[in-house]
Amino acid sequence: MNSSNLENFNYKSSIRDEVVPSRKRLTLPPWLEVAKPRLIPLLLATTLGGMALTEEWPLSSPKLICTLGGGALAAAAAGALNCLWEMELDKRMIRTSKRALPSGKLSSETVFLAAVSCTLAASMLLISGVNYLAAGLTLLGLCSYVILYTVILKPRTTKNIVFGGVAGAIPPLVGASAATGHVGLSGWWLFGLVMLWTPAHFWALAILLKDDYASVGIPMLPSVKGSLFTAKAISRYGLATVLMSIMGVFALPEGGLLYGIMLLPFNGRLLQLINKLKKSPDDLLRAKSLFRWSILYMFGICLLLLISRTQLSVEFEQQSMQIFFSIGSLLSN
């Protein structure tokens, strides 16, 4: 690698580290690194969101622990299997060449055994402590990430994250099924929201890393179509995400009014950052800002769903309706 390429790589790496600052401050042990623990909290948050959309919320502590524990173990297994499959690819990229598997810190046999063990443990925990549907959906999410996205779609099409995003959208279904034994329309709403949010979220990151992906032949949208095309696609999916998020007002069993009010600043900020990137699609700082906010956005949606199911939210909705009807009566007189 010549000096100019090395300088470009160092710049891109610094951008990536700034997007996820913990990468600078925290070095994970090899066995934890392959589990991709940074991805797990958001998966568990959307699982909780799926639970909050049901009449059975809140769940008993044992069922809640088993659901989240099983989900975390399955996500860790999926991350490890993803690292195994992409080990040779990671060796070819300086940014990833020092990871646990390509650097030889862990053997492929050890990682595979750990992934199988986590999968079995997740299955046992979910079957014994939750139900068969939650266990089956969790395994479906694992297989979707490893087989559908990593093996089939990622190396072949620019639409990889559009269809492969199903893996990240399954946790809400797991949460709903854990609570009720079935998914229900509200669970499917959150599934759809995550599906629409995922491309806009991931493509913002892919703009930062488009040269990395291009160097190893991975057809991410920014690498193939360019930043301008990608920014326009992000705009479309971002608008669809905002419209879908509003439907949560009707998806919630109660507390939809408070959810709708609190949702406004989240959607406003998301649209603002998307519009800024669309105006300057090659601005890495704008792509970074959008990527960061998109993560906070989904965490925020899930938090709003939980808040909306509290007694305070129910009382707020009741009082608001009383005021509304009182005003209506005064106007009619």
From Swiss-Prot:
Its main location: membrane. The keyword Cell membrane applies. The chain crosses the membrane at residues 64-84, 110-130, 133-153, 161-181, 189-209, 246-266, 287-307. It holds the Pfam family UbiA. Its EC number is 2.5.1.141. One of its GO terms (molecular function) is protoheme IX farnesyltransferase activity. Carbon 2 of the heme B porphyrin ring is defined according to the Fischer nomenclature. Pathway: Porphyrin-containing compound metabolism; heme O biosynthesis; heme O from protoheme: step 1/1. Disulfide bonds: none annotated. Keywords: Cell inner membrane, Cell membrane, Heme biosynthesis, Membrane, Transferase, Transmembrane, Transmembrane helix. It is found in: Cell inner membrane. This is Protoheme IX farnesyltransferase. Converts heme B (protoheme IX) to heme O by substitution of the vinyl group on carbon 2 of heme B porphyrin ring with a hydroxyethyl farnesyl side group. One of its GO terms (biological process) is heme O biosynthetic process. One of its GO terms (cellular component) is plasma membrane. The keyword Magnesium does not apply. It is a multi-pass membrane protein. Belongs to the UbiA prenyltransferase family. Protoheme IX farnesyltransferase subfamily. It catalyses: heme b + (2E,6E)-farnesyl diphosphate + H2O = Fe(II)-heme o + diphosphate.
